[in-house]
């Protein structure tokens, strides 16, 4: 059964947006499967996928967003981490995981299965135990929810990632608000997640001036003297700020085709940073 583990984990992670929770869900599915009478199970793989998806949907349905400092953001994953068991090509971008939070769990699952794994409506209906018409309706609602977002069809642009990261880090270190503004689109949004343990200065800022001012304030008051690494999480570039081997803050960036920053996802929640190891591409 372990041969299915990575695929099951990828399904679960895309639905729940938390690597730790996804691991627990898959482990629970596998442990329960061991005790089942398998005489009527014809396709082990399909059975485990179906069980995992429905378990993840039920978990997401029960899960109430905890009171957090700032905005709730997904747990990022690095594919270069030896402990990460996700299938890279099938794992959603960080931006997409953020967008999927606007959908209910079944809409989220239907969207992921159709758009991420190219399932037919017949296959989705079987997995979710609904009709094909219900599957179409779920996907239609999901698309309507996401279509107003300019990032619904977002795909990462890696060509200019390191150049932008370098300029971004230098501007922060020098408290250069003008240069920061030059790196941001006009309607830039910054979202910060401190979880239940770390209070953030601001959960959300929109616009060049407000965002650049906040970034410099945080740099000068909380990140001075920290070392940094440039890394990738969920297919997107990021800068991580460290004190020795302890990670304090991670900025995941969304870049447009011109290398400008459209979104900044700032994570300071220690529970979401604990699986990140110190890697550097520079």
PLM feature spans:
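A short, charge-rich alpha-helical start-of-domain segment used by transcription regulators
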Residues: 1-10, 20-23, 39-40
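Short, small-hydrophobic-rich alpha-helical interface motif
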Residues: 8, 12, 22-33, 48-51, ...
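Sigma70-family region 2
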Residues: 27-44, 63-64, 149-153
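Amphipathic alpha-helical segment used for protein-protein interaction
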Residues: 79-107, 161-162, 166, 170
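Helix-turn-helix DNA-binding module
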Residues: 105, 117-134
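A short pre-motif secondary-structure segment
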Residues: 110-111
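Solvent-exposed, charged amphipathic helical/linker segments at domain boundaries
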Residues: 126, 132-212, 216
């Amino acid at each position: 059964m372990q041969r299915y583990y990575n695929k099951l984990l990828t399904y679960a992670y895309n639905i729940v947006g938390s690597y730790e929770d996804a691991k627990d869900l898959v482990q629970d599915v596998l442990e329960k499967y061991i005790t089942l009478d398998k005489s009527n199970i014809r396709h082990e793989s399909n059975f485990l996928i179906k069980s995992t998806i429905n378990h993840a949907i039920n978990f997401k349905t029960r899960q109430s967003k905890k009171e957090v400092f700032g905005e709730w953001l997904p747990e990022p994953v690095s594919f270069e981490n030896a402990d990460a068991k996700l299938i890279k090509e099938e794992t959603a971008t960080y931006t997409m995981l953020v967008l999927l939070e606007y959908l209910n769990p079944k809409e989220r699952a239907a969207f992921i299965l159709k758009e991420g794994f190219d399932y037919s409506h017949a296959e989705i209906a079987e997995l979710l135990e609904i009709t094909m018409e219900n599957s179409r309706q779920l996907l239609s609602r999901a698309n309507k929810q996401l279509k107003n977002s300019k990032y619904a069809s977002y795909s990462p642009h890696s060509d200019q990632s390191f150049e932008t990261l370098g300029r971004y880090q230098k501007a922060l270190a020098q408290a250069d608000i003008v240069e920061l503004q030059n790196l941001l689109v006009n309607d830039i949004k910054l979202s910060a997640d401190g979880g239940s343990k770390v209070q953030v200065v601001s959960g959300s800022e929109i616009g060049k001036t407000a965002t650049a001012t906040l970034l410099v304030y945080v740099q000068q008051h909380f990140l001075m003297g920290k070392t940094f690494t440039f890394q990738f999480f969920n297919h997107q570039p990021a800068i991580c700020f460290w004190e020795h081997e302890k990670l304090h803050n991670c900025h995941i960036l969304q870049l447009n085709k011109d290398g400008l920053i459209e979104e900044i996802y700032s994570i300071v929640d220690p529970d979401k940073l604990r699986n990140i190891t110190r890697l550097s591409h520079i």
